[in-house]
Amino acid sequence: MRSHYCGSVNESHLDQEVTLCGWVNRRRDHGGVIFIDLRDREGLVQVVFDPDLPEVFATAERVRSEYVLKVKGRVRRRPAGTENPDLPTGAIEVLGRELTVLNSAETPPFQLDEDEVNEETRLRYRYVDLRRPAMQKRLQMRARVSRTLRRFLEDNGFLDIETPMLTKATPEGARDYIVPSRTHPGSFFALPQSPQLFKQLLMMGGMDRYYQIVRCFRDEDLRADRQPEFTQLDIETSFMDEEGIMGLMEEMVRELFAQVLEVPLHTPFQRMSYAEAMARYGSDKPDLRIPLELTELTDIMGEVDFKVFSGPARDPAGRVAALRVPKGGELSRKDIDDYTHFVGRYGAKGLAYIKVNDLNAGREGLQSPILKFMPDTVVVEILGRTGAEDGDLIFFGADKARIVNEALGALRVKLGHDLGLVERGWRPLWVVDFPMFEHDEKEGRWVALHHPFTAPRVERPEELTGNPGEMISRAYDMVLNGTEVGGGSVRIHTTAMQQAVFNLLGIGEAEARDKFGFLLDALKYGCPPHGGIAFGLDRLVMLMTGSQSIRDVMAFPKTQTAHCPLTDAPAEVSDAQLKELSIRVKKQTASG
């Protein structure tokens, strides 16, 4: 039907006859000559129609934006002075000789070059939104990313193997999407939150190296980087420890950036322990492009006459930390109030500060309402530890360590962006030595920080003694510019170790048998040492395209309320369907 893409026609095609198909991006009538910018996936080209061909010209006069056309014509050089250097096709145009309207179009709900379009409207008319050049480029890059990753893994001996979509609910942290079974009334499948157990079973089945680009489902509250259904690059390999896995994944990501973005990433990637990341950045996914760090002050605040600081300093679960902002003394009182309100979202009760006006003037050169509570020795220690200089501002966080880390960690990122401190480029990082467990305060029990199949950094089950909060796992996360793009671990591969971890998590023998019996059985029959990783493909493409949300790199995403404006899903089903599934829906009343 066509000989070329619109965006691929160039000077090498001069004087050639081409057949093009696409949408009308714009139509202009200049002095009896009609110009149509014809657009397809690869770009647009200018087509010229003159009155020498009356029938063709008359058809061109009737054409409007977003009409679908087929054009046949000759490629020629644009007249001198009319070239468009911003277009790959800007040196040429096509003199139209035949024109067929393949379909007309109503006026679209928004212009494709309109920037401020309500997201609900964009998703409602996604088929129009997808025609935007920006969306086309993002999805094309997504395809290139997938192709490059597949090629690398295939070249390194990995097999693309599918795992079930209809499976059994397992406790993985988020709520499952469940699917009723018609043939087993009262029973339900669950859509997979990840292929975790199946990929481990593939290793037990001798598949050695597995990968899959797979859809995963989690029924959780949504944020800018979350969707109810999302795509993972899932990887598992046998007979390889964490050093081997991380090294291979570094090579894969380096190859990806070289091929798709033509950006060199230097290996090996930087590594940092979880404890160091939390101490220095208040986050287990620090953005290393921001040159701001937290400074530990807990050890010197226990005896100050200021309960806001001394209380957390004496609390084993508390923390007092500082965040020095170079030249932050220029921030106004309103700015500080705004940042105080910002950290309040993370549970912080306030945001104490010291402005450093003149270090040579001693206390007189400092400005802060909290100085009166601090002896000279503590003030000197704060200034020394933070490396304060004239013109700086020092913020403080004092509370439970979790709140301090979340509040100052988020403030660090916000200040970095607000003050233009974010360096250009890419800063990949491995975060390692994660805690094996964390304490769930609401449930009053220990839970797995990653998942209960992560191997601990001990050789024998009997070594799993002492405080669970101090046990270290063989887990690793890949972080890129402050976003976790991949997470994995070496897995437990013996029955005794798996049962010991279940016991620490309060999962009794009966519950373990009910939920994971198939895994426990498989471990008995010669399970190899194995490990793996999963990359969030949507997040990775979001970063590589410079997008603000993963919704911008997915063809048909849901809203932040897990609703699809295009299809109006989720929707009610008929009583007949419910009856066939042995389901009765209890309608919610106004009181809930």
From Swiss-Prot:
GO terms for biological process: aspartyl-tRNA aminoacylation. L-aspartate binds at residues 172, 218, 450, 491. ATP binds at residues 218-220, 227, 484, 536-539. The keyword Protein biosynthesis applies. It is found in: Cytoplasm. It is an enzyme of class 6 (ligase). GO terms for molecular function: aspartate-tRNA ligase activity; aspartate-tRNA(Asn) ligase activity; ATP binding; nucleic acid binding. InterPro entries: Aa-tRNA-synt_II, aa-tRNA-synth_II, aa-tRNA-synth_II/BPL/LPL, Asp-tRNA-ligase_1, Asp-tRNA-ligase_1_N, Asp/Asn-tRNA-synth_IIb, AspRS_core, GAD-like_sf. Keywords: Aminoacyl-tRNA synthetase, ATP-binding, Cytoplasm, Ligase, Nucleotide-binding, Protein biosynthesis. The record marks 30, 81 as: Important for tRNA non-discrimination. It catalyses: tRNA(Asx) + L-aspartate + ATP = L-aspartyl-tRNA(Asx) + AMP + diphosphate. Residues 196-199 are annotated as: Aspartate. It holds the Pfam family tRNA_anti-codon. Gene3D superfamilies: Bira Bifunctional Protein, Domain 2, GAD-like domain, Nucleic acid-binding proteins. Its EC number is 6.1.1.23. Its main location: cytoplasm. CDD domains: AspRS_core (cd00777), EcAspRS_like_N (cd04317). Aspartyl-tRNA synthetase with relaxed tRNA specificity since it is able to aspartylate not only its cognate tRNA(Asp) but also tRNA(Asn). Reaction proceeds in two steps: L-aspartate is first activated by ATP to form Asp-AMP and then transferred to the acceptor end of tRNA(Asp/Asn). Homodimer. NCBIfam families: aspS_bact (TIGR00459), PRK00476.1 (NF001750). This is Aspartate--tRNA(Asp/Asn) ligase. It comes from Thioalkalivibrio sulfidiphilus (strain HL-EbGR7).
